[in-house]
Amino acid sequence: MKKIAFLFLLFFSLNSFSQTQLETDEEAYNNYYKADRELNIIYQQILKEYKSDAEFIKNLKTAQKIWITFRDAEMLAKFPKREPGYYGSIQPTCWSNYLQELTEERTKRLKIWLTGIEEGNMCSGSVNIK
């Protein structure tokens, strides 16, 4: 009897934590969306902080456009166009997760223009010194 009660509780506790594929896809997309919003906030802060450096701003905008092109190409390299169903029902989740990963990597790189580089770094380039 104890085994039956245990299995019954185990089944319902596991079932309560499960998600549908649609919920998993939605959660992954929302995580990507948050990462993308953060990237855009950081990008706008950089534009504001460095607004007096026209050459840097021009180059940053060019770099960001190229990064978007790279990101899109990277997505297609990881998930080439295939017949429907090739990647299975998990594909939207995988797509969003990889977009999130690429976006967070870009945000990390951009943040350096806001956090600055330690004084004494001879290769700071356009990045402000702390």
Regions from the PLM with identified roles:
Residues 17-130:
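N-terminal alpha-helical modules
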Residues 3-18:
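Sec-dependent N-terminal signal peptides
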Residues 1-2, 105:
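Short, intrinsically disordered low-complexity segments
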